[in-house]
Amino acid sequence: MKIKLAFAVLLALCLSLSVMPVLAEQAATRADLARYYDDVTSLQGRFTQQTHDESGRILEESSGEFWIERPDRFRWNYAEPWPQEIVSDGERLWVYDQDLDQVTVRSLADSLGRGPATLLGGTLGELEEAFELTFPEPGRVALQPREATLDYEHVLLRLEDGVPVELELEDGLGQITVLRLEALERDVEIDPGRFEFQPPEGADVIEAGGGRTL
């Protein structure tokens, strides 16, 4: 009986010791994530984006530049293959499709968590409100939407040196979009005009949830 008890205690100790490094790694990744949202005031760089289906076939590739400034101000300029601008002034979100000469505008609060721009440009509180966070590997954060109304079913964020470098988003059709960030500069001064948007003259402007104005 004593031998069995000693073995059980030893096994429990071994299991607890094996779990401790994992918990430490999870805590470190969570701390890195919190520092990004709490301490990094701005981030800018270039990006590439690739979408492929569940079989791995590439459906779309794009690239461009981005600027993020807290709280909730950002601009993503897609240069290829179809020019597009996604701009937030902290209150409203503008999406301008140049080839369609069309602008869609909505409240930023209604858009949080719906795409890379709002995921990376928001706050940690907004992120935790929209997603359940887990930490499957060092430097990786898995985000599970709390509501089925969001555009993606699974999101995986990869951190490197305390900032996001890759975002993987899977939708309900099994399509996966991978966004990679490069040439990153953090805590730099960004021209406030980057986060302003004026619809081009003659563009079709659509108020999401409302009517259409010309």
Swiss-Prot record:
GO cellular component terms attached to this protein's record: periplasmic space
Protein name: Outer-membrane lipoprotein carrier protein
Pfam families referenced in this protein's UniProt entry, alphabetically: LolA
Organism: Alkalilimnicola ehrlichii (strain ATCC BAA-1101 / DSM 17681 / MLHE-1)
Family statement drawn from the similarity comment of this UniProt entry: Belongs to the LolA family.
Keywords: Chaperone, Periplasm, Protein transport, Signal, Transport
Oligomeric form and interacting partners: Monomer.
Signal peptide: 1-24
Subcellular location: Periplasm
Chief location category: periplasm
A GO BP entry: lipoprotein localization to outer membrane
Purpose: Participates in the translocation of lipoproteins from the inner membrane to the outer membrane. Only forms a complex with a lipoprotein if the residue after the N-terminal Cys is not an aspartate (The Asp acts as a targeting signal to indicate that the lipoprotein should stay in the inner membrane).
Domain of life: Bacteria
